[in-house]
Amino acid sequence: MRVIALSMVVVASCLLLSACGAWQTVSTATSSAYQATFYKKITVLNVDLKARAMINPDEVGRPYSVVVRVYQLRDTKTFTSASYDDLLTKDKTVLAQDLQDIRGMVVYPNGAASMSQALKPNTQYIGIVAFYRDAKSSDSWRLIVPKKDLSADDPLVLELEGDSIMQPKDGPARG
């Protein structure tokens, strides 16, 4: 009798432990399915730039190409406090504490450019700078997009016009 009771306790313990493992497996699988269905993790930053015919005008109104840099940042404090000249000449030094990655491209008048890069895990913001010939005192040459506003499916679409960089008015931040 005692052996049977002891055997039943051992069997019950094994079943209980197996059930815990099965429950954990089901719970993990359910969580993974939820994440895959309702939350798309952004692993790639896609940026599409479109330039109007009249960008970066000189003194007589002739358009010129513009250098655009895209920064992956942990925070925006150093980016927003940095001057145009600081970002132009020593961006890596000025942004060192927040900088995750940096890419640059040239955009021509009435042209377009696209960029695709791996999104670094600690990136919380995307900072974009267009280095115009004659940057005005306003921050129209600089733009910040929070990571939460990006789409896993659509690129971040930006427009260059005159001496400004902006998100199109006819669509959301994600393009």
Regions flagged by a language model, labelled:
Residues L16-A19:
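C-terminal motif of bacterial Sec signal peptides marking the signal peptidase cleavage site
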Residues G21-Q24:
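Bacterial signal peptide processing site
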Residues A29-K50:
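Post-signal peptide N-terminal segment of mature Sec-exported envelope proteins
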Residues V47-E59:
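Short amphipathic, basic-aromatic surface patches that mediate peripheral association
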Residues V60-R69:
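Short coil-to-beta strand junction motifs in C2/discoidin
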Residues N110-L119:
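Exposed aromatic-hydrophobic patches
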Residues T123-D134:
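A short, solvent-exposed beta-strand micro-motif common in secreted/extracellular proteins
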Residues L143-G175:
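Glycine-rich, aromatic-bearing surface loops/beta-hairpins
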